[in-house]
Structure formats: C-alpha cells, structure tokens
C-alpha cells in the first residue's frame, strides 16, 4: 500500500516537472517572436516620424519654387515692358482739310436748320460747284436703267446723295448770280426740281415702276431747265 502511494506521488511529481519544462521551453521559443514584433513596431514608428519630419521640408521646397517662379515671371514682364517701343502721335491737323476726312471739320453746324438745308460738304467756288453739279446731274439721269429693270429701290441711296450735292452746289452757284436772278431761280426752277426728285425717291421706295417713270421724266425735264437757266 505504501509502495503504491509512493509510486503515485513520484509519477505526479514527474508529470509536474515535465509540464513545467514544457512551459519553460514554450516560453523560450516564444520569446524571440515577441521581440521581433516590438522591433518592427519601433521601426514603423521611426519611419512615420521621419516621413512626418520630411513633409514640412517638401512643403518648404515647393513654396520656395513658387516664389522663384513668380520672381522670374515678374522680371520677364518688366523686360518686355522696357523693350516696348512708344507710338509716335502727330499733332492736330491744320484747319479746314489738313488730312483726309477732315475737309469739313471746321464748318459751323446750325442744328436748328431742317435736314435738307444742313449740309456737311466742303464749300467750293462757284466754278467748281458748277462742275460738280453737272456730274451730279449725270448720275441722276443715269438711274433710268434701274427703273427700266424695275430695280428702282436699288438707286435710292445714290439718288439721295447726288440730290444733296446738287442742292448744295446749286445754292452756291445761284448765290453768285445777280440779285434779280437769285429769287426766281430759287423759287421757280430749283424748288420744283427737288420736289420732283423727292417724288421719284418716294416712288422708288414704294417699288412702283409706273410712278417712278412718271416722276423720273418730271425730274429730268426740270433738271435740264434749271441747268440751262444757270448756264
């Protein structure tokens, strides 16, 4: 009986010893793995700290690059502006037609006058005005071809332009005539002439070929009468 109890105690102690040995061996084998994990975590933390320390440096470098680019562009713009050549601007044109398009720049304008009497044409001498009025008369007579083709609306602008020149030049020529001729020419011949031209203008605006032919014949007849009286 005593021997059996002694053998049982011996086996239990041996089992305890074997279990402790196993636990110690397992703890010994697990030790290096834990150390490796701790070291890996330390390395990751060090890398994160180094990357966070490098971020301000990269931002600082980017800012310095932007500043350098801005300074270079500013210096380039200054160089371009410094090389710009000034534009030479001449003085004002001389009075009464010193340059093209200024022939009537110094004429007085009376805005209270009717539009037909408000002229923007350079004054000419009576001789030059008589020559230009003959040219205007030829242009007015030449609108017959448009009337024959029933294209009366195509000459309205030219008819108005030539009528304006003719009115202005007739006034210049009539003003140079003796006093007893001025009034009769203005009232009888010249007045009727421009009324006939206005009627022709209106007929062309309406695109009425019969009326255009009628008023054209009246205008040409009156025009020839006026030119024959003025000479």
Swiss-Prot record:
SUPFAM superfamilies (alphabetical): Oxygen-evolving enhancer protein 3
UniProt biased composition (Low complexity): 18-30
One Gene Ontology term of the molecular function aspect: electron transporter, transferring electrons within the cyclic electron transport pathway of photosynthesis activity
InterPro entries xref list: PsbQ-like_dom_sf, PSII_PsbQ, PSII_PsbQ_pln
GO cellular component: chloroplast thylakoid membrane; extrinsic component of membrane; photosystem II oxygen evolving complex
Keyword terms: Chloroplast, Membrane, Photosynthesis, Photosystem II, Plastid, Thylakoid, Transit peptide
Region (Disordered) residue spans: 15-57
Subcellular location: Plastid, Chloroplast thylakoid membrane
Main subcellular location: plastid
Keyword Flavoprotein: no
Cited Gene3D superfamilies: Oxygen-evolving enhancer protein 3 (PsbQ), four-helix up-down bundle (1.20.120.290)
Biased composition (Polar residues): 48-57
Segment annotated as transit peptide: 1-82
Pfam families tied to this protein: PsbQ
PANTHER family: OXYGEN-EVOLVING ENHANCER PROTEIN 3-1, CHLOROPLASTIC
Family: Belongs to the PsbQ family.
Record's protein name: Oxygen-evolving enhancer protein 3, chloroplastic
Organism: Onobrychis viciifolia (Common sainfoin)
Lineage of producing organism: Eukaryota, Viridiplantae, Streptophyta, Embryophyta, Tracheophyta
Name of the coding gene: PSBQ
